[in-house]
From Swiss-Prot:
Component of the central CCA1/LHY-TOC1 feedback loop in the circadian clock that promotes clock accuracy and is required for sustained rhythms in the absence of daily light/dark cycles. It holds the Pfam family Elf4. It comes from the Eukaryota. Homodimer. It is found in: Nucleus. InterPro entries: EARLY_FLOWERING_4, EARLY_FLOWERING_4_dom. One of its GO terms (cellular component) is nucleus. This is Protein ELF4-LIKE 3. The lineage of its organism: Eukaryota, Viridiplantae, Streptophyta, Embryophyta, Tracheophyta. One of its GO terms (molecular function) is protein homodimerization activity. Belongs to the EARLY FLOWERING 4 family. The gene is EFL3.
Length: 109
C-alpha cells in the first residue's frame, strides 16, 4: 500500500525500478516509526511535566534527549531520501538521453 502511495506521488511520467521504490518505502517507514515513537515520548513528557513529581521531571531530561536524537535521525533520513531521489532522477534522465529521447535542437546564433 505504501509503495502505491509512492508510485502515485511520482506520477505516471516517471519510471523507477522496484529496488529504488523499496529503498524509498523503507526510509519512509523508518521515518514514520520514529515519528510515532516521538508522539509517545511527547505525551509522556507532557504527563511528567503536569505531574510535577521530581522523579518524573528528572526522567524528562532523558526523554527530551531521546526526542532530540530522534528528530536528528529523521532529518538525516530525509537528507538521504533527497539525495537518493536526486540520484535516481539524474540516472533516469541520463537513460532517457541515451535512448534518443533527449534530442536537442541547435538554435541559430
Amino acid at each position: 500500500m505504501e509503495g502505491d502511495t509512492i508510485s502515485r506521488m511520482m506520477g505516471s511520467g516517471v519510471q523507477m525500478d522496484g529496488k529504488i521504490l523499496q529503498t524509498f518505502e523503507k526510509s519512509f517507514v523508518q521515518v514514520q516509526n520514529i515519528l510515532d515513537h516521538n508522539r509517545l515520548l511527547i505525551n509522556e513528557i507532557n504527563q511528567n511535566h503536569e505531574s510535577k513529581i521530581p522523579d518524573n521531571l528528572g526522567r524528562n531530561v532523558g526523554l527530551i534527549r531521546e526526542l532530540n536524537n530522534n528528530v536528528r535521525r529523521v532529518a538525516h533520513l530525509y537528507v538521504d531520501l533527497s539525495n537518493n531521489f536526486s540520484k535516481s532522477m539524474e540516472a533516469s534522465s541520463e537513460g532517457d538521453s541515451s535512448e534518443g529521447r533527449g534530442n536537442r535542437r541547435i538554435r541559430p546564433a
